[in-house]
């Protein structure tokens, strides 16, 4: 098996819904990786949520055995990578494990923003790229137009593009021949000392952590003592193998191969993706380039709707963390919502997926506070802080300046929706950097504050472009900004869970919208309830929920006026006491609806 010239390591790059997982299914079927009765749609997407949303979240790998037309047997290692921007780092290290890529483009839709980001990463990794145009059987397919578009935008030669329909299986053998003939084999091993790239890891209840690796130099075998270079932790390898996509145990993984190993590792957090694995006795001198720890970008609070579920939530988060090292959380408490967790995510899709998995896999009913980002605070006394929880924001008098993160967004949109998209970006405080046309699609590059993106930007972009716009972003810089903490008071009590950090120009509009929303959601009481929005000590908006009138005289039929007066005085005293000590219960539904307000 140590014939490197017969190995091909490749990944599939595609935008969401362009047919990446379907093509992977056809390749597995064609090479006999699974029997026809074992095939299911999107074999490599192991989570239900991946199949339902049509997205890939975790990188998966599969070894295919293909007998080519030249008579040789080739071993093809397919790396199915995530396509969404939140998982860009997972994509980058999956690409680093390969020598080539299949660029799959939907011939009815053309190039999307997401595809661009991943193709440029593949080119940076010196990948050979084979262009595959999919969905050829659809009436709206325009392969020649899409080829021209790809040449104009990406600049790669499209004359040898492979035309296929993954769904109906047309052209799959052409794809396999192109992989064998056009993609290069792994480079010859330069040393016998083990050097392997940690591509991904997940938790198996029986084996502990399973680690996906690409062996660059040397070999990895059972009972070897290995060392992770980023964490300096040492383990003994228990099992070595590969996926077809079933698990196969083998004795050794040679240079150029992609496979997995287990080593009684207890948690995924110990396995940093992109780390270098080497032999403990003879370590390699230099780690592989490109490793960087993943830092959360978006934060929010997760609280159980029923406080008795707290321990269940704690256990569930710990289990999710086993499989997702980029997800972080810490305990926090709120006077309005009780005890919960402050969680950090790679982006909004990551947040949605974690939320959905908590409710689906662990049967939890949760309240999510408004998402926020990391702000840099420069204090007057010279201290510098980084905060992501509005409750931690110091008094404005003590702050010298505040900085917020900005992103660089690339948006591809059909010509007729351009006006609506430009006005949305302007409304979100965006600055246009570039604007170009490719055929009948516009490509615009905007600089936008991340704070404005985390609410509802993606949903609104999709609705104002009828779903045709695609959007990709990367972190750019931190810039000084006029930010304020918008507080919500109910009966003069601050509701910390509804506090947010907003730009001063948006504070009044957002404060009014929240007050109006809460007025409709909080049930009436026997006293007037004041709902106020404030910046510091200044009230910027107010709504009042009028009191219910409880008729205490209904049981007095006629009779003495002093009896009625006595009852009215008693009610008056009770209302006074309620105003003094009364705690207004805000229902959970009010929180959930108020937090969904975005920037309506």
Swiss-Prot record:
One of its GO terms (biological process) is positive regulation of translation. GO terms for cellular component: plasma membrane. This is Elongation factor 4. SUPFAM superfamilies: EF-G C-terminal domain-like, P-loop containing nucleoside triphosphate hydrolases. GTP binds at residues 17-22, 134-137. The keyword Membrane applies. Its EC number is 3.6.5.n1. It is an enzyme of class 3 (hydrolase). One of its GO terms (molecular function) is ribosome binding. Belongs to the TRAFAC class translation factor GTPase superfamily. Classic translation factor GTPase family. LepA subfamily. It is a peripheral membrane protein. Required for accurate and efficient protein synthesis under certain stress conditions. May act as a fidelity factor of the translation reaction, by catalyzing a one-codon backward translocation of tRNAs on improperly translocated ribosomes. Back-translocation proceeds from a post-translocation (POST) complex to a pre-translocation (PRE) complex, thus giving elongation factor G a second chance to translocate the tRNAs correctly. Binds to ribosomes in a GTP-dependent manner. Residues 5-187 form the tr-type G domain. Pfam families: EFG_C, GTP_EFTU, GTP_EFTU_D2, LepA_C. It catalyses: GTP + H2O = GDP + phosphate + H(+). Keywords: Cell inner membrane, Cell membrane, GTP-binding, Hydrolase, Membrane, Nucleotide-binding, Protein biosynthesis.
């Amino acid at each position: 098996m140590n014939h490197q010239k017969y190995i091909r390591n490749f990944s599939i790059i595609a935008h969401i819904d362009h047919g990446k997982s379907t093509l992977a299914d056809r390749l597995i079927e064609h090479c006999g990786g699974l029997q026809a009765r074992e095939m299911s749609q999107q074999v490599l997407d192991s989570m239900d949520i991946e199949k339902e949303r049509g997205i890939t979240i975790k990188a998966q790998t599969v070894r295919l055995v293909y007998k080519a037309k030249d008579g040789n047997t080739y071993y093809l290692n397919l790396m199915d990578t995530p396509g969404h921007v939140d998982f860009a780092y997972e994509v980058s290290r999956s690409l680093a494990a390969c020598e080539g890529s299949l660029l799959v483009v939907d011939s009815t839709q053309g190039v999307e923003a997401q595809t661009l980001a991943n193709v440029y990463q593949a080119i940076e990794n010196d990948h050979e790229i084979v262009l595959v145009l999919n969905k050829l059987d659809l009436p709206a397919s325009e392969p020649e137009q899409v080829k021209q578009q790809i040449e104009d935008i990406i600049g790669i030669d499209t004359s040898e593009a492979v035309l296929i329909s993954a769904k109906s299986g047309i052209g799959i053998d052409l794809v396999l021949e192109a992989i064998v003939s056009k993609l290069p084999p792994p480079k010859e091993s330069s040393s016998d000392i083990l050097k392997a790239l940690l591509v991904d890891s997940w938790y198996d209840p029986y084996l502990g952590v399973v680690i996906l690796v690409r062996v660059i130099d040397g070999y990895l075998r059972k009972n070897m003592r290995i060392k992770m270079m980023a964490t300096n932790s040492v383990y003994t390898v228990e099992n070595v193998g590969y996926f077809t996509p079933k698990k196969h145990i083998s004795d050794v993984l040679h240079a150029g191969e992609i496979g997995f190993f287990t080593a009684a590792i207890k948690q995924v957090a110990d396995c940093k993706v992109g780390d270098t694995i080497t032999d403990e006795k003879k370590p390699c001198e230099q780690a592989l380039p490109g490793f960087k720890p993943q830092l959360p970008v978006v934060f929010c609070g997760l609280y159980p709707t029923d406080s008795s579920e707290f321990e269940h939530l704690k256990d569930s988060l710990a289990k999710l963390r086993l499989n997702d090292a980029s997800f972080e959380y810490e305990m926090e408490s709120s006077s309005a919502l009780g005890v919960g967790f402050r969680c950090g995510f790679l982006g909004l899709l990551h947040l949605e997926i974690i939320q959905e998995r908590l409710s689906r896999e662990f049967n939890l009913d949760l309240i999510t506070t408004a998402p926020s980002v990391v702000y840099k605070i420069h204090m007057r006394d010279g201290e510098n802080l980084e905060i992501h929880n509005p409750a931690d924001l110091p008094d404005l008098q003590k702050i010298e300046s505040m900085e917020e993160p900005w992103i660089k967004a690339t948006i591809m949109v059909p010509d007729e929706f351009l006006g609506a998209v430009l006005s949305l970006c302007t409304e979100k405080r965006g600055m246009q950097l570039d604007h170009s046309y490719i055929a009948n699609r516009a490509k615009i590059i905007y600089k936008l504050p991340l704070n404005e993106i985390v609410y509802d930007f993606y949903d609104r972009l999709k609705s104002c472009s009828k779903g045709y716009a695609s959007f990709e972003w990367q972190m750019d810089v931190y810039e000084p900004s006029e930010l304020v903490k918008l507080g919500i008071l109910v009966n003069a009590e601050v509701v910390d869970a509804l506090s947010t950090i907003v730009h001063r120009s948006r504070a009044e509009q957002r404060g009014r919208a929240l007050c109006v929303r809460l007025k409709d959601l909080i049930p009436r009481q026997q006293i007037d309830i004041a709902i106020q929005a404030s910046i510091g000590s200044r009230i910027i908006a107010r709504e009042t929920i009028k009191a219910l009138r409880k008729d205490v005289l209904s049981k007095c039929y006629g009779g003495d006026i002093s009896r009625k007066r006595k009852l009215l005085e008693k009610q008056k005293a009770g209302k006074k006491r309620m105003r003094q000590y009364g705690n207004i219960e805000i229902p959970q539904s009010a929180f959930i609806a108020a937090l969904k307000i975005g920037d309506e």
